[in-house]
Amino acid sequence: MKKLLCPSMMCADFSSLKYEIENLEKSGIDIFHLDVMDGSFVPNFGMGLQDIEYICKTATKPCDVHLMIENPSKYIDKFAKLGVNIIYIHPETDPHACRTLQMIRDAGVKSGIAVNPGTSFETVKNLLYLCDYVMLMSVNPGFAGQKYLDFVTEKFEKFVDEAENYGGYDVMIDGACSPEKIQMLSKIGVKGFILGTSALFGKDKSYKEIIDELRGL
């Protein structure tokens, strides 16, 4: 199973963003991961619409957007028009998550949910038929550089085991995604990995060297 390696662009150097995008694409990454935060659902602010539009227009690889915001349904059409390929919502923020996931698909975009560490499989299982991707948070959302929460490993196993019963979604991980965790989780069937400071950014090696090493794990 080929891994999906997805650099978290919140960790990139925005003073040379075009160069970052080009280097990451040359390294062989699969999807650009773009974080949007509203300062309400999470106590931080993420990338702006102009940043996302620029990355989507500049990149030749797909882009996803992770909406850590209240009332995500209000913004689905806006992000779809910017050119994103995948939209993740947090069901914890949306009382009509089923409708919002269908809106995403109707907009011609792949749909996903991001599941907080404290949210169980049972809580979201009725949404899974409408998901192309399920991204499990292994840290509390909103900040880079946190430590992996060990108790979520069992939840990864549950979501992987149930995938075929709910339409065959791909399982992703976001948060503290180190090479050691990538190796462990890929063995149990996790497909995609959001790469931040734990695995990709701020290292002494080139992006290509790191991506090649992660592919080999």
Regions found by a protein language model. Give the residues of each.
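Glycine-rich, proline-tolerant flexible connector loops at the mouths of alpha/beta enzymes
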Residues: F32-L49, V139-G145
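Glycine-rich phosphate-binding active-site loops on the catalytic face of alpha/beta enzymes
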Residues: I89-P95, M135-G145, I188-I210
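Conserved, mostly hydrophobic/aromatic
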Residues: L17, L24, D35, F79, ...
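Conserved anion-binding
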Residues: S16, K74-Y75, N85-D170
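Structural motif
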Residues: S27, T58, L82, A107, ...
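Alpha/beta enzyme core
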Residues: E20-L34, K78-K81, V124-M137
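Catalytic cores of alpha/beta
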Residues: S73-K81, T119-Y129, C177-F193
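Hydrophobic faces of well-ordered beta-strands that scaffold small-molecule active sites
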Residues: L4-S8, F32-L34, C63-L67, I87-I89, ...
